[in-house]
Every structure is written in structure tokens, then in C-alpha cells.
């Protein structure tokens, strides 16, 4: 039990490290800025899509009210009034204005995809028709799914009102769970569809459930803060709602992006437990696998490296690829696969270690054994090198900095 608890703590630390490394707070700030401009266009698109179906006619405002009541703290009531006014005015725009609103909505989706691809270490985002179809599906199917879910909620409510609480046992509990269910569905769809990478549905669902629960908890705590510490009203006065709403949007995106980090790393949850080897040693191991596959005329992906015994997490693999690609060792051949494109016979180990951005491993950090044919010779050479360094530089600083030794020769 204690071991599982310690593993959970270590995994949480790993996720926090990845959250910062992936620049998620910066992405959340960018998404907050984009959301300010895109929230009205997104609502306008939602109303337009719902108005195309007679059964959903007039349901847009009810959905908007439902969203603000269940997904925004109580401080958002004034913002809701303003947004309803802006959205009503936006419906009377000319076709030029409509195009501008559509572009703004697409810009928000581009920013979301960019943030997710940063977390999933995706080097090449979607392009062309594939990107357009994904965004159009989100903008069109999203409101329709919301409308369908809201219609089911309305039906359950009316059934209870007309035939009494016994008409549908558990209806009240079901209605109370509707906001959480909508959140889980929305986050699951977001995590599975937006990244330009393969995301297992099971992991997306787990991340959606985690994010939805965290979102509900944050909403409750944020509402308590607003009600118990109203000092911001003394500072901002009539404009107090604006900074509070901005802060809530930022916190919401932080939660969404942390959920994305969780989903991304669920597939590598076993790899973070391993004791990391010094990067130069890992680099040599990766080059050895690249060289072997080159001899067979085969390309390489991370899964091939795992099969060869090097269980690297994806972020470390991407970090090594960045260096190897910069030094023109490897080239991408499509489909996320890589090939060795340099003759290793013309490149010395000394040159590689000098170009390597990671420090040379100390004797204490060198693994005692490694299942690699090249490692014993490398280990022996490193021990001799460090012993020679200790012999040459073992004297005290006072000895080296003394004037009498300024012109002394090292022998």
C-alpha cells in the first residue's frame, strides 16, 4: 500500500515537471487571450447550427444559460448578460462579419491544437483539408451534441413534472449528474480528437473524468473565494467582474492542459519509474539501434527502441531526436519514422561527446553493468579519462593560483 502511495506521489511530481516543461502555463495564458475574442463567435456558431434543426429551435439561449449556471462560478452572471447582448448583435452582421467571426473561432481551435501538440511532442500539426474537417466537425457537431443532451435533460425533467417523481426513479440524481457527464464527454472528445497523435480512447476517458472532477472542485473553491474575499470589488469597483472572469478562464485552461498532460503520459506511466541513465550513454545506445536498423534497411520509431531494451519516455526520445536531427545524424521519412543519414565510420566519439549538450557522466553515475557490447570499453575509457583528469587537476586552487606556478608546465 505504501509503495503504491509513493508511486502516486512520484507520478504526480513527474506530471508537474512535464506540465512546466511543456510550457502549459504560457499556453493557458495564450488560450485565455484567444478565448476573450472567440467566445462570442463560438456562441454565434452554436446558435446558427442549432437553428438549422427545427427540433432544436430556440434552445441556444437555454444551453447558454445552462453552461453559465453549471460551468462558470457565480461571478459570471454579469458576464453572461453582456455575452448574450453581444451574441444577439452578432446575429445581425453582414457576411463579411460572419466570415470574421468564423476565422476568430478557427483561430481559437488552432491555438488549442498547438498547445496539445506541444504536450504530445507532435512535430507536424495537421494541415489542409484534415485540419479544416476536424475544426468544422467540432464547430458543427459540438453544438448538435449539446442540443441533443439538453433535449434529453428537458425530457427527463418534463417526465418528472407530468407524472410525478416516481415516473423515472433516480431522475433527480440523474439531472444533478448531467453537468458532470457533459464535462466528461466534452473533455474526452477534446483529448481524443484534437492532438495530431494516436490517443487511446481509454486514456482520453480517464483524463476526461479526472479533468471534469477537478473542474467541478475548482469551480466550487473559486466560488467560495469570490464570496468570502470580496476585496477585488474594492479595487476594481464596477469592473470587478472582468478580472475575476479572466482569472477563471485562465484557471480553466490550466486544468484542461493538466488533464492533457495526464492523458499524454498515461501510456508511458511505467517508464517514469526507471532510474534515468546519463544522457550521453542513452545517446550512444540510441545511435547503436539506429545503426543496426540501417544495416537492415529499416526505419525506426520509439517502439523499436523499446523492443531493443531502451525504455525511453517520449519526451526524452524527442529531446534526443532534436539533437540528432540538428547534427544531421537522422532524417524523418514520414509516418513518424526516422532513419540514420550519416556514416558513423567518419564521425569520432570524441567529436560526438564534445557536441553533446549534456554533461559527461561522473564515475558514480555510470551504471555498473549495461547489456550493450560497446559499454565495457566505454566504461573503461571514461574511468581512465576521469582518473587522468583527477591527476592533472587534483592540486588545490591555492597551488594553481600561486604566482610561482603561473608558468609551470603540466607533465
From Swiss-Prot:
Keywords: Cell inner membrane, Cell membrane, Membrane, Transmembrane, Transmembrane helix. It is a multi-pass membrane protein. Pfam families: Virul_fac_BrkB. This is UPF0761 membrane protein PSPA7_4558. Belongs to the UPF0761 family. InterPro entries: UPF0761_bac, Virul_fac_BrkB. It is found in: Cell inner membrane.
